[in-house]
Structure formats: C-alpha cells, structure tokens
C-alpha cells in the first residue's frame, strides 16, 4: 500500500506575507474554499495575534471550512497561542501551529537566550496549545542552519510535551537536497519518540531547491509537505504545491507515495490565486505556466501529433486544462499546420498545404505567433491580390477628468472610406475609445482579455496592449504598440477587428464554393 503525504497549504499565511497589498477577508475566503475543493489536508490561514484583520479572517475561514483542518500560526508565547485558539475554535477541525527559532544565529542574535531556555519555551508552548486541541504542530525555525543534536533534542522535547506534528523548516532556503534529506533521516533515526508524530517539511526557494528538498525529505521519511499555490511566499517563495503534488503523482513508481489532492482543480486554483494576489505566473513555470504544455519546436510538434507521450510526461487534463497548445511560430513544422487545419475541420483536399505552409512561414516571421483564423485566411484568401487591412485607425483623441465622464473622438478608414464619431462615457478613455470604434463598425464584440505590458524603460517606453475579443462564439487576438496607452489599446482593437473581417471573408468564400 502506498503511504500518503499530508499536504499542508500555507498560501494564506506564508504566501500572503509576500504580497504588496493584503487580501480582503472575502478574497481569503474565496481562496480557502478553492483549497478545500482542491483537497488540501490542512490549510494555514493566518497569524491571529498579528492584527485584528488577521484574527477576523482566520475566524471567518474557520467557520466556513468543513473538509480540511484549519491551522493558525503562533509564536511560543501564551498570548499568541490563546489568540490562535480564540480565532480557530469555531472550526470543525483545527490545528495550532507554534514555532520558535532553533539555530545558534537566531537563538543568540534574535531571542538572546540559551538553547536550554528555548527548549523550555517550546515545551511550555506545546503544552499550552494541547490544552485547547489534540492537534498541535511544533516548528523549529531555521532548522536548516541548526546543529542536528539540537534539532533532535528540541523535537524530542516537543513530542513529549504533546506535539503531533514536528516541522523541520529550511527557513532561508539554504539547504541542498542531499543535505536536507540527511537531516530528516537523522531526525527519524535519532529521536526516540518520533513514531508519535508526523515529520513535516517547510522549504523556501532562495536557491531554487524548495521542490527538490521537499521530495528528498519525503524519501527520507517526512510525511507532510508545507507548500503554497504557485510557490508564492517570502523572498523567492515557498515550495510550490502543484510541483510537489504532480511530481509525486507522475513519479509514483519512484516515490511510492500519494496525496488527497484532486489534481483536476490545480489549474483553476492557480489562476485564482494569481489574479486575486496580483502575482503573475512566469510563462515557463512548471505545471501551471502558460507555456507548460505549449510546444513550438517543429520536431517536438511532429512527435506530439503522432504520440503525445513523446514530449509530454503528464497530460494537461490531469490539472484541469483542456488540451495542450501547439503554438504556431516560425519554428513550427508542416505537421503542426496540418494538425491545426484538421482541428478546424478541414481535409487536405480543401486547401494546398505546400502553398499554405510557405505563406504561413512568411507571416510567422513577421508576426511571431499565428492563430487558427490567420491560417484560414492564408488558406482561402488569395494574398497576391493584396489583402490589405480593411480597417485603419486614422485619428484619435481622448479626454478624461475626475469630474466628467471620459470622451473620445475616433476617425477610422473602412475600405478607404472615412468614418468618424465621438463617444461619451465608459470607465475612462480606453473604454470611451472602444465604444466609439464599436459604434462605427457595428460589430458585436465582447472583450475577454486585456493586458498591458511596458516595452523598454522610463518615459520612452512603449505600451503594448494584447487583447482577446469574442465574436459569434469565436476568439480573436489583437496587439497594439504605441507610446500612448489609449492609442495602443485602439490599435489592438482595430487589429482584432481586421482578423474578424478576414474570418467573414473566409466564410463567404466557403459558402460560395458550396453553392
């Protein structure tokens, strides 16, 4: 039978500490409910003594969570432990997590105590917490830089006092995997009463080792991993939940352990945390990055189309994503282009693959990424006849003050003919410009994504706007680049509308062929 590893999520405690702005109670509850659906065993949701706001959010979450243990942090201080209990007592099941520093550096410089005093404080804290609950976790902070004899001594004392989980954190991300695994193995072998508690690990990512250290610890006997969604946390972050969970799942042959996590929820929770915390996910982040399942090399794409297992060790569906993306770029091969056309329902007889692939490479060199509707336009519209953009932005001005709604004046050229209009209202100048453009074109368009990135430094920086719009159930992309954000936003919308016009033209050509 495989052993189970307890997943202790600390997104709302250690993760939240890293944010520039605190989350509201409502946002924290939203994340907590998502973590409950994800299937975490324990969620650490705050440090109640630190502020009234933290106390209230811990209490609110404790009241709503039914299928996970709710934990709160406290120093080895009576008032902290009492506050943690007061906030948690409404929960179905709760844990008090108390900690004290154990490394010589912390003990002498921060606590200004002897190690004997520290052991005494740890024992008193665990005993006090045990008065409130039989689920008490004890952490020796900065264990990674504490001598092994001292770790074993304080852990043994904490277990004797009633700790049911003992956490050996690498607080500053200092350890390397073999070294950390060795610490866990020694705790397991040298602490006489270790069978009465679960060994937990809490790793930071300062040297990029958090995932590796946590997995090595499990191989050496740890049975709880403390982690956060997307690896958010102080400095370089914490162990990433999605990475350790998927590593244990994909390499169960090697690890021999599993978790209670419903991996289908990973993508959804990852996106929610990223948005609510305003913490973008790096595109090449393992498991949840936007490129994690995207293949753009021609050789890889050809292999993927023949057999997914050639370059994919886990399927995107396991984390709740629909399908891997084969990005069409200048590096894509004919197989990927043909595959995209087949996905849209076209047989090889419907178009000339050689001609399409040549045109595709020209466009990809110019544009970077090519979308499905671009392929259709290349396949069915004769580019030699000069496929100019039907819509061009001619003139633009927008004005906005605090007192009055935003106004915009827009002049477009549609098929060479000038059209102009003014619009009032909207949530600012960009909105006013969009209203004006949509009024002029008469298209029904819904905005589903808007992203602004600065290209370059300082006042000379260009603002690039990337948008995704929906028209008749289909998504179209637009990009605009200008020194002025309103102008780059307008250019992005015009770009997307030109893609829509091309799609209309393709549809007309197809209808004409059928009649």
UniProtKB/Swiss-Prot annotation:
Name the UniProt record assigns to this protein: 2-isopropylmalate synthase
Gene: leuA
Pfam (any one): HMGL-like
Cleaved signal peptide residues: none
Ligand binding (Mn(2+)): 14, 202, 204, 238
Superkingdom classification of source: Bacteria
GO biological process terms on file: L-leucine biosynthetic process
Classification lineage: Bacteria, Pseudomonadati, Pseudomonadota, Gammaproteobacteria, Pasteurellales
Organism: Haemophilus influenzae (strain ATCC 51907 / DSM 11121 / KW20 / Rd)
Record domain Pyruvate carboxyltransferase: where: 5-267
Subcellular location: Cytoplasm
EC numbers on record: 2.3.3.13
MF terms (GO), sorted A to Z: 2-isopropylmalate synthase activity; acetyl-CoA C-acetyltransferase activity; manganese ion binding
Keyword Kinase set for record: no
HAMAP family registered for this protein in UniProt: LeuA_type1
Region (Regulatory domain): 392-515
């Amino acid at each position: 039978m495989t052993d189970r590893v307890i997943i202790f999520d600390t997104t709302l405690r250690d993760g939240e500490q890293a944010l520039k702005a605190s989350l509201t109670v409502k946002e924290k509850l939203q994340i907590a409910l998502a973590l409950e659906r994800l299937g975490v065993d324990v969620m650490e949701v705050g440090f109640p003594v630190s502020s009234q706001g933290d106390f209230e959010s811990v209490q609110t979450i404790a009241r709503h969570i039914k299928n996970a243990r709710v934990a709160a942090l406290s120093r080895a201080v009576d008032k902290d432990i009492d506050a943690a209990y007061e906030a948690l007592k409404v929960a179905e099941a709760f844990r008090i997590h108390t900690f004290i520093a154990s490394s010589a550096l912390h003990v002498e410089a921060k606590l200004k105590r002897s190690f004997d005093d520290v052991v005494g404080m740890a024992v008193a804290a665990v005993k006090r917490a045990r008065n409130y609950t039989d689920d008490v976790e004890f952490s020796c902070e900065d264990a990674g830089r504490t001598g092994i004899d001292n770790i074993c001594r304080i852990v043994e004392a904490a277990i004797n006092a009633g700790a049911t989980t003992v956490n050996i954190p690498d607080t500053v991300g200092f350890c390397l995997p073999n070294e950390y695994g060795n610490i866990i193995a020694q705790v397991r072998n040298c602490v006489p009463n270790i069978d009465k508690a679960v060994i937990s690990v809490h790793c930071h990512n300062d040297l990029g080792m958090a995932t590796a250290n946590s997995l090595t610890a499990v191989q050496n006997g740890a049975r709880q991993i403390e982690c956060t969604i997307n690896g958010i946390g102080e400095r370089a972050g914490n162990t990433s939940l999605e990475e350790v969970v998927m590593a244990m799942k994909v390499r169960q042959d090697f690890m021999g352990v599993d978790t209670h996590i419903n991996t289908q929820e990973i993508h959804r929770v990852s996106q929610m945390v990223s948005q609510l915390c305003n913490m973008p996910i790096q595109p090449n982040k393992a498991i949840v990055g936007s490129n994690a399942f995207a293949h753009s090399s021609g050789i890889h794409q050809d292999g993927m189309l023949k057999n997914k297992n050639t370059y994919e060790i886990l399927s995107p569906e396991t984390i709740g994503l629909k399908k891997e993306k084969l990005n069409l770029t200048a590096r894509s091969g004919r197989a990927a282009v043909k595959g995209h056309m087949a996905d849209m329902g076209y047989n090889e007889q419907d178009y000339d693959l050689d001609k399409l692939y040549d045109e595709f490479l020209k466009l990809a060199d110019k544009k970077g990424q090519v979308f499905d509707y671009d392929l259709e336009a290349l396949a069915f519209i004769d580019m030699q006849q000069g496929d100019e953009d039907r819509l061009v932005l001619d003139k633009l001005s927008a004005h906005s003050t605090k007192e009055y709604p935003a106004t915009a004046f827009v002049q477009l050229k549609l098929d060479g003919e000038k059209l102009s209009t003014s619009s009032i209202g909207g949530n600012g100048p960009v909105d006013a410009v969009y209203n004006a453009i949509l009024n002029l074109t008469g298209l029904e368009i819904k905005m589903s994504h808007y992203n602004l990135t600065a290209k370059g430094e300082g006042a000379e920086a260009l603002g690039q706007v990337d948008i995704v719009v929906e028209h008749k159930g289909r998504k179209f992309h637009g990009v605009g680049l200008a020194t002025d954000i309103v102008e780059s936003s307008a250019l992005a919308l015009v770009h997307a509308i030109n893609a829509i016009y091309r799609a209309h033209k393709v549809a007309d050509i197809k209808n004409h062929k059928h009649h």
